[in-house]
Amino acid sequence: EDLPMIPDPFRLVVRQVRTDRGMVTDIAAGRQLKVIGEVLAGCESIIVATDAGREGELIFRWIYSHLGCTKLFKRLWFSSLTDEAIRKGMADLREGYEYDSLYAAADSRAKADWLVGMNASRALATASGSANNSIGRVQTPTLAMICARFKENRNFVSTPYWQLHIT
């Protein structure tokens, strides 16, 4: 009856922790976001230096959006932490909007992961009668590989590779 679960709209919330009063905002996460917000509010320019890739772009954009920041930003793109690579990246800063497609891809993947994980896990829990099972895009095939390797090890039969003969 509860499926599919499709939030409208998707909302980001600060990490929550379970307490005796229920779920509450993680104090450390809230404090860190406050610091980032103060830095963004007080700066003249923003250079994004998160990991070069979808996930790094997503992390920055989610924080940027959550804080309601509207300042333009530049992107520092490098995949090595050598002085030379960082200097080269700083000399070649790109406009933030050039990475909008990368962000959209990461955001879509994150939402799809949530939809598949939550709905498939709920369906599995309903069908199996156990709420202790979960399904995920990466988790499920990884677990399948671990299980296959476990079975392979358990069923392993030792055989000699060579025999010694004395002549």
Regions found by a protein language model. Name each.
Residues 113-167:
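Prokaryote-biased recognition of long, low-complexity C-terminal linker/tail segments
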